[in-house]
Amino acid sequence: MEVKAFIEIMRPHNCILAGVVGILGSLVAYEGIPSIEKLGLVFLVVYLGCSAGNTINDYFDVEIDRVNRPNRPIPRGAIPRKVALYYALLQYMLGLALARFLGVEALLFALGAYALTFIYAWKLKPLPFIGNVAVALLTAATPIYGALGVGRVGLAGYLAICAFLVNVSREIMKDIEDIEGDMKMGAKTLPIIIGKRRAAMISSIFGVLTVITSFLPVKVGIGLGYAPIILVDAMILKASIDVVKNPESASKGQKTLKIATFIAVISFLLGALTKGV
């Protein structure tokens, strides 16, 4: 076994980003700066849920990874498959142990999110559209968990809704982008089943719904710092229109949506901090 493989299988860069989004969810909901202890706990619970999910995903995907990603820890023999399972379970347990310090609601929410990461890797991942929705739900759950960690939801609820909708759109675009490889692997993604054009239209619908939803925080008095959301909406609309006109633009579109999501999170944070201004 390779010691570094236990870090590698977590995919720490992704988990750190998820933890930061959890913290941003706390800040947006709190409309200020909560205690460092709570922010630290939110970060760790989100990080461990993400890392456990990545580990268990590699456990279930071992046969596919032997073909597509042979350099990953399990296929190359750096971590025995059974050890990876135990390692994932350990991370889940550590995360839940920490979540209890944030209260019952935060603990139960973490338990549900952790369970979804396991079920997704085990059964949902290959299912057309359902797998896309599961990923989007987990993405949306991150800022909500941050909000629960500080005892209120507030504007983080609107952030979560927008995150869910835009990530359904993005996940479908990613499936359009990967259609050739997925067909060779015998996968049954939405674009393979209904075609790239129809899948692009569904992706576009979720993009437009995101833009519509982004106006809801204005009704509850979000601050002027929310103004960059106009740029976000323009980026989402352009990507949504482009993918319908030309499904081959899905690769560029999903990257655009990723950048737009980051700007949106910052917009929500600035809007929360300037509320009443």
Curated annotation (Swiss-Prot):
Catalytic activity: sn-3-O-(geranylgeranyl)glycerol 1-phosphate + (2E,6E,10E)-geranylgeranyl diphosphate = 2,3-bis-O-(geranylgeranyl)-sn-glycerol 1-phosphate + diphosphate
Entry EC number(s): 2.5.1.42
Annotated GO CC locations: plasma membrane
Top class in the EC scheme: transferase
Coiled-coil boundaries: none
Keyword Membrane recorded: yes
Superkingdom of the organism of origin: Archaea
MF terms (GO), sorted A to Z: geranylgeranylglycerol-phosphate geranylgeranyltransferase activity; magnesium ion binding
Cofactors that this protein relies on: Mg(2+)
Subcellular location: Cell membrane
Family membership: Belongs to the UbiA prenyltransferase family. DGGGP synthase subfamily.
UniProt protein name: Digeranylgeranylglyceryl phosphate synthase
Organism: Pyrococcus abyssi (strain GE5 / Orsay)
